[in-house]
Amino acid sequence: MMVLQQQQQQRLWDATTTSNTNTQTQQSANVESTPTKVCHQENAATHTFMRHMSNSPTPPSPLRSLSDCGKSFEEEELELGENCEMPQNLSSKRQARELDSELENEVLDLAPPPKRLAEEQEEEKVASVNPPQPVAFAPEEMHQALQLQLHSYIEMVRQLAPEAFPNPNLATQFLLQNSLQALAQFQALQQMKQQQREDPLPSYSTPLAKSPLRSPSLSPVPRHSKSQQRTPPNSMTANSLGMSSAVMTPNTPSMQQQPQLQQSTPKPTSGLTVASAMAKLEQSPEETTDLEELEQFAKTFKQRRIKLGFTQGDVGLAMGKLYGNDFSQTTISRFEALNLSFKNMCKLKPLLQKWLEDADSTVAKSGGGVFNINTMTSTLSSTPESILGRRRKKRTSIETTVRTTLEKAFLMNCKPTSEEISQLSERLNMDKEVIRVWFCNRRQKEKRINPSLDLDSPTGTPLSSHAFGYPPQALNMSHMQMEGGSGSFCGSSISSGE
């Protein structure tokens, strides 16, 4: 046991000597350090050695001073701090472990001290009570400052480059005008700001408790009736412009331009004009006419006109001679195709309906003769040209097999003689005039396709099948094969007359 104590004391002595050597090296490196610091380090080392001697199980050494007897190990450790390195034994390690476990649950107070908080609060109060006022200059002061800057600038330019300003008065005038303009703008801006401060905009917001809740269906959105929704887009524009029976194309501006057009239209000023406008609206046929009814009438009118054998130009000419309203073929065509505005179609409908009734009654009186122009003209007018003008011949529909036979005959001879046309008409059971017109139309079509071909030669030379895209075997087919087979009617039709 004594041996262990001696070994421990020897180790402590070695540690003390090493600390002394460290302090000596620090003193040699730091020449400017004071002697008091050196003494303090030596005393600390001595105290450390004496403290460890007192904590040992052996009786206290007589070298320990009486002043240190009343101090515990913790107090001496707090006094020394981190000034020197001290050897650790088992007891110091155990105490350090206990201190660490206590510091685990300790909360650090990182808040600033109350004194600094009070100073910051005082500074904030002073800043809020006396905010920094912006520097405000009167217009006269600004004008004087601008003039001073102007004069100094001119003097500086004269000194640096006198040849740059041969006439300094002009430069002075120019700069003075610019400064005056800037001053006027600044004054106007200040006046606007003052007015905004004096007259704030009134707020029209309604409290939430009093504002009624409105659904999207109840919102004040302009709505149209069913008849207006089914109206073509050109009708609203035509109504707003008050147009007459002029032709309205599909490219007519739609409802998007209606507000602008209404603004440009002069409004009625007197009560009489308003009353007359209301009377015209009441008498217009748009209220009693529906779009579906118009569509149905246009379809029926076209069918009846074709059945009676009259062209659109005939109808327009007859309406001009009978009722005093001249209409072109384009207007009748657009009416049948529903390409007119709703208002114009409503105006045209009664006139066309009247013409159709007159034409039907005339045909019925004549005993069902469709092309009896004399009967119709004697009933409706004195001259034949006053009602229908020209008459239109029937259109002939050609079957697919017949058209194929005609195409092959055209390849063999593009310009047949009258005898060949008669033979074809007998073989195909068709009218001779129809076959002649078909060959004429086919030659015109071939000219459009191949302008270089000479189809007007007096002799009907056979054409090459390769020029028209037909196989060579098509020219060697028999008449039985050409006539054999049943085909369906197709939509191709030719006109036997003008």
From Swiss-Prot:
Q: According to its UniProt record, in which tissues is this protein expressed?
A: Initial expression in cellular blastoderm stage, then in ectodermal stripes during germband extension. Broad expression in the neuroectoderm followed by limitation to discrete subsets of CNS cells, and expression in specific PNS neurons and support cells.
The record's section on InterPro entries has:
HD (IPR001356), Homeobox_CS (IPR017970), Homeodomain-like_sf (IPR009057), Lambda_DNA-bd_dom_sf (IPR010982), POU (IPR013847), POU_dom (IPR000327), POU_domain_TF (IPR050255)
One matching Pfam family, short form? Answer: Homeodomain
Can you name a GO cellular component term? nucleus
Chain coiled-coil ranges: none
Q: Is DNA-binding included in the keywords of this UniProt record? A: yes
Q: Which family does the UniProt entry place this protein in? A: Belongs to the POU transcription factor family. Class-2 subfamily.
Keywords of the record: Activator, Developmental protein, DNA-binding, Homeobox, Nucleus, Phosphoprotein, Transcription, Transcription regulation
Gene that this sequence comes from: pdm2
Q: Gene3D superfamilies recorded for this chain? A: Homeodomain-like (1.10.10.60), lambda repressor-like DNA-binding domains (1.10.260.40)
Q: Where is this region: Disordered?
A: 1-35, 191-273
Q: Where is the composition biased (Low complexity)?
A: 1-30, 207-222, 252-270
A single GO BP term for this record reads: generation of neurons
Give the principal location in a single coarse category. nucleus
Q: Give the subcellular location.
A: Nucleus
Classification from the root reads:
Eukaryota, Metazoa, Ecdysozoa, Arthropoda, Hexapoda
- Name of the molecule in the record: POU domain protein 2, isoform A
Enumerate the GO terms in the molecular function aspect: DNA binding; DNA-binding transcription activator activity, RNA polymerase II-specific; DNA-binding transcription factor activity, RNA polymerase II-specific; RNA polymerase II cis-regulatory region sequence-specific DNA binding
Q: Which organism is it from?
A: Drosophila melanogaster (Fruit fly)
